[in-house]
Curated annotation (Swiss-Prot):
The gene is psd. Its main location: membrane. Keywords: Cell membrane, Decarboxylase, Lipid biosynthesis, Lipid metabolism, Lyase, Membrane, Phospholipid biosynthesis, Phospholipid metabolism, Pyruvate, Zymogen. Pfam families: PS_Dcarbxylase (PF02666). Is synthesized initially as an inactive proenzyme. Formation of the active enzyme involves a self-maturation process in which the active site pyruvoyl group is generated from an internal serine residue via an autocatalytic post-translational modification. Two non-identical subunits are generated from the proenzyme in this reaction, and the pyruvate is formed at the N-terminus of the alpha chain, which is derived from the carboxyl end of the proenzyme. Pathway: Phospholipid metabolism; phosphatidylethanolamine biosynthesis; phosphatidylethanolamine from CDP-diacylglycerol: step 2/2. It is found in: Cell membrane. This is Phosphatidylserine decarboxylase proenzyme. It comes from Shewanella sp. (strain ANA-3).
Length: 292
């Protein structure tokens, strides 16, 4: 059965399917939208008591529901200066060192940090010998992405690609999954060195958005696009620890890359398959400089 599921992913028109779902999710269909939201809540056992708007009728579109805000204070941010926090609600897929430009995906599978970053060689060099963490967001999860530490945006790259599912089954069977799928790479400058936040697209992910540029995808294309940003002055984009940096419309994956000597140890309980909650301790920092 697993082989059949994987084979179907290779055969399906994934981009066409994802864009169709995106149009449906953006539509405001009144009672039909509310019915779809109620079904989704029941199907995935979503705790709406955490949402700022707990009633399904409050959402005009499925996208509004899917990118719902949480109640203030429901995800308190760990403010300790030696702590990096979880950027999302989800589950840890993998984490560990970046060795010889290789990142571990699943048993028998690695992929290249250079490919992940859109073949930006200078960016890849900055993370050699550092660490990575991959976090999977299931459909039930809160889908806004937040900063694990304070950082100033220096670069963003859109990388075209496939739209395979990014669930654990696919990660075990599709080589180079996260470096094959469409993705948006944001590089931040922090007091601990560079931080890469890679927002990976997936089947039926209608769009990837950032707080500074809005919707990045769709539209899509076959060309890599890069934007550079000032890191000083009035136009610099600096986001605090715990501040929102982007969002997915339907579930996907975030891959984070950290510079060498940024992380001392991952926090207790942070390991593959561990559930993550945005704002909780994710890693202990080697550099004692303020990270918030």
């Amino acid at each position: 059965m697993d082989k059949v599921k994987i084979a179907l992913q290779y055969m399906l028109p994934k981009h066409l399917l994802s864009r169709l779902v995106g149009k449906l999710a953006a539509s405001e269909a009144g009672a039909l939208t509310t019915a779809a939201i109620k079904w989704f809540i029941k199907q995935y056992k979503i705790d709406m008591s955490e949402a700022a708007q707990s009633e399904p009728e409050a959402y005009k579109s499925f996208n509004d529901f899917f990118t719902r805000a949480l109640k203030p204070g429901i995800r308190p941010i760990n403010t300790a200066t030696n702590i990096m926090v979880h950027p999302v609600d989800g589950a840890v897929s993998q984490l560990g060192p970046i060795k010889d430009g290789r990142i571990f995906q699943a048993k028998g599978h690695h992929y290249s940090s250079l490919t992940l970053l859109g073949d930006q060689a200078e960016d890849a060099k900055r993370f050699e010998g550092g660490d990575f963490a991959t976090i999977y967001l299931a459909p039930k999860d809160y889908h806004r992405i937040h900063m694990p530490i304070k950082g100033t945006l220096s670069k963003m790259t859109y990388v075209p690609g496939e739209l395979f599912s990014v669930n654990p089954l696919t990660a075990r069977h599709v080589p180079g999954l996260f470096a094959r799928n469409e993705r948006v790479v944001a590089i931040f400058e922090t007091e601990l060195g560079p931080l890469a936040m890679v927002l990976v697209g997936a089947t039926i992910v209608a769009s990837i958005e950032t707080v500074w540029a809005g919707t990045i995808t769709p539209p899509t294309g076959k060309q890599v696009f890069t934007w550079e940003y000032p890191t000083v002055g009035p136009d610099a984009i600096t986001l605090d620890k715990g501040e929102e940096m982007g969002r997915f419309k339907l579930g996907s994956t975030v891959v984070m890359l950290f510079a060498k000597d940024a992380i001392d140890t991952f926090a207790e309980g942070v390991e593959p398959e561990a559930v993550t909650r945005m704002g909780q301790a994710f890693a202990n920092l080697k550099n004692q400089a303020s990270a918030d």
